[in-house]
Structure formats: structure tokens, C-alpha cells
Design a protein with these regions (language model features):
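Catalytic cores of the polymerase beta-like nucleotidyltransferase superfamily
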Residues: 1-141
């Protein structure tokens, strides 16, 4: 995934400019890149699945609230995804503070993890979306 990240990132940005969400953009960019690679080289499915998974995990590093951080650090490929995130800092795609936060988060005890997540409340642009209730129409009979 590290070898192909720069091209995947460029493809992702082109999809974002077309109006796709961050997750859909990276999903399409990764699929397109892997199709190009498979025309010239042979990779086993398990390696292709790993590359795809590492790329898709990058979108989850933007979520600091709720259960997302806890489920991400339990993921089997979390450490590899964190290394890819560190590479993205060198490419100026991600702030170093993000990598430091995730590194500290996965190493600290559970009690501190809860405090870290609560400490991020209000600092991120994340907001929970709620469905708007529809008003009942009053009958005029």
C-alpha cells in the first residue's frame, strides 16, 4: 500500500473534486489503482485485500469520537495502517498531531483512552447527525 499511496492519493483527490465523499473517493481510487496493477503484475488476492484494507482504514483516522477509535485500534491491520498514516505526514496530507494522538491512544491504558476521546469533544468538526422529525399534518375536518 505504501508503494502505491501517492498515486492512490492523486486519484482520490480527483474523485473528491467530482463531488464524491472521502470514503467513496478512496474506495474508487484504490480499486482503479489495483486494476492497473493487475494488468502488469500478478498479486495474490490476500495481498490485494490487504492493500485495499489499509487504504480504506485511512479514512477512519479522522474519527476521534464515540466507539470509532476503540474499534479501530482493535482492527487486525491497525499497526500497518498507522505506519501508512505516518507516511502521509511526510507527504503533507495529515498533521503530525493526528499521528501522535493515535500512537498515544493505542498505547495508553483504557481509563486514559476514555479521557482522550472525551477531550476531543468540541475540538473536531464531527457532529452527530439526527433525523429531523416530520410534523404531523393537522386534519382540517
Amino acid at each position: 500500500a505504501v508503494l502505491f499511496w501517492e498515486k492512490i492519493s492523486k486519484l482520490k483527490m480527483s474523485y473528491i473534486e467530482q463531488g464524491f465523499s472521502d470514503y467513496i473517493s478512496i474506495q474508487r481510487a484504490t480499486s482503479e489503482m489495483l486494476q492497473d496493477i493487475n494488468q502488469n503484475f500478478y498479486f495474490q488476492r490476500k495481498h490485494i485485500a490487504g492493500i485495499r484494507e489499509l487504504c480504506l482504514l485511512q479514512t477512519r483516522f479522522n474519527k476521534f469520537l464515540g466507539k470509532s477509535p476503540f474499534s479501530l485500534i482493535r482492527h487486525a491491520r491497525f499497526r500497518s495502517a498507522l505506519k501508512l498514516l505516518e507516511l502521509r505526514v511526510k507527504l503533507n496530507e495529515v498533521k503530525i498531531e493526528t499521528v501522535v494522538w493515535w500512537d498515544k491512544f493505542h498505547r495508553c491504558p483504557d481509563s486514559e483512552k476514555i479521557e482522550m476521546v472525551n477531550g476531543m469533544r468540541g475540538k473536531t468538526g464531527q457532529r452527530r447527525s439526527y433525523k429531523k422529525r416530520r410534523r404531523k399534518k393537522l386534519s382540517t375536518t
